[in-house]
Amino acid sequence: MYDRKFVAYENLSKFLFDGIGDYEIPLIKKDDITFDDFIGFNFAKSCKNSKDKCLHFYLDDYQFTRLWNRPNNYINLISQFSCVCSPDYSLYTDFPKAIQIYNHYRKHWLAAYWQLHGIKVIPTINWSDKDSFAWCFDGEPKNATVTISSVGTQNDKIKRLLFLQGYDEMMKRLEPKKIIFYGEIPKECYGNIVRVKAFQEKFREVKLDER
């Protein structure tokens, strides 16, 4: 049997990190973070004054799958920004558990790989249901600045409950010093929260101004 570190498979030949937990999730280190604006990866190439901005991935997964497929091709682009969020690969509750864990692993592998190249990373915290709590916080730093999104979770009773349960669990386990909150903030959420308007909100505001 081949030694796995020499197999060009799922980026293992690029770097093999020591992992955390049962699924060997790469660790994201705690970084000191400062930025003036929060923009999506889909605007990265056209962005001006990128040194003052943080790059996020609150987008459809297909828009940043290429980062996993060709990670070295995007190091120079990403390194132009003040900091970058770890990729927000989806953890939908109806996804098979294996896919959810794989997406969590990919998020952490890319974030840890970027940190190896001197890029500052904000951990994007995500979960699906209560069962995911067994692994979805593996590899996340404690007492760090983190980011979460409530987009798509507040228009359904069950989704909203799952979001709040995960939020409470995040606060207990990670004790974040600051939470960059993308989207609507439920009244039950607490902590040192900095709200960022989601693209959908900004779009609605523009449409209202045009009337």
Where are these regions (language model features)?
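SEC14/CRAL-TRIO lipid-binding/transfer domains and related phosphoinositide-recognition modules
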Residues: 1-93, 109
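Alpha/beta catalytic cores of nucleotide-metabolism and tRNA/nucleoside-modifying enzymes
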Residues: 3-4, 209-211
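Eukaryote-skewed repeat-based solenoidal scaffolds used as protein-protein interaction platforms
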Residues: 47-48, 55, 67-208
